[in-house]
Amino acid sequence: LEPPQRPALKAPTDYRIVGTPRHRLDVPAKVDGTAVYAVDVRLPGMLHAALMAAPVFGGRLESVESATAMARAGVKRVVELEQAVAVVAETHWQAQTALAALSPRFGTAGHESFTSAAWSDQQQQTLRTERGDNDHSVGDVDAALVEGSRRIEADYRVPYLYHATMEPMCATVRIADGRAEIWTGVQDPLQTRRRVAKVSGIDAERVTVHNHPSGGGFGRRMPLEGDYVEQATRIAMAMAPAPVKLMWSREQDVRHGFYRPAVSARFEGAVSAAGAPLAWRGRFTGRSEGAAARPLYGIPNQDIRSVPMQSHVPEGPWRSVAFSQHGFFVEAFFDELAEAAGVDPFEFRVANLGDRPRHRAV
């Protein structure tokens, strides 16, 4: 077929679906409780796994004495993983209570003294000593800072954040007859299939992903390296051909997430005697975040830089991505500039959105 050079678009008067209300097909099942989430999966002969990971990120399992757990009713096996230990039993409660009876020894990888507060202080100190990588520059910020009638500075910091999904991490995996199947709720089924294939050694074409609705995702249910999908796969390999459901406890879920990055930022700015913003200098820790770190407003002199810093704490996707941190940084400092200019923050914004009519309308 020859594609048309100028395809004719359907006239709005001929629309039959666009612009009409449509109800989600899954709403009734979610309302009446019949929707099947990953935690609801039940398979014939299914076993249950409970898991304890190293209390320090990066720590490895050194040893575990399994006899106490194995002596409990329903317990089938204690499975040792690189950075965790799991108990497999006939029911989740049996697995969880047997897990509590274990006293595994984990290494700390040298991170036992790490604290979020100390990491935040280190970020702030680094911002005072390092210039960083250029993200965005326009005009002459140094000259504008001298020229301004009032100059201000501000430091901001935001912590690691836990996704707090209503449904904890959960997956059921079956390895049998040269095939792998996984029942879970993820935001990237294809990457999940690749993860299961890599861990199990089974070709991806022989891996089936049964993707269920998830009880909250917000970026947390991306299949990340070393996460629950890989753990469930390794446990199922040890128990093949029986299907095994791994469900994290809430405590495990809080302690071993892939968190929104902790970020610190430092700003300098200046306003003119007429109350207009003249200069904006921003530095922040972490990778370049592009538009998220740039103010929307008409500031003639800007210098925005990122200072790469990375801790051992697992970081993952977060809903709204970098705007979660930088939206707060940018708008809070713009409020500070408005205060320095003696102008109402709303009026200050409207006055400096001249080339952004869409934003002015909002």
Descriptions of predicted regions:
Residues 1-362:
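Structural alpha/beta core scaffold segments of enzyme domains
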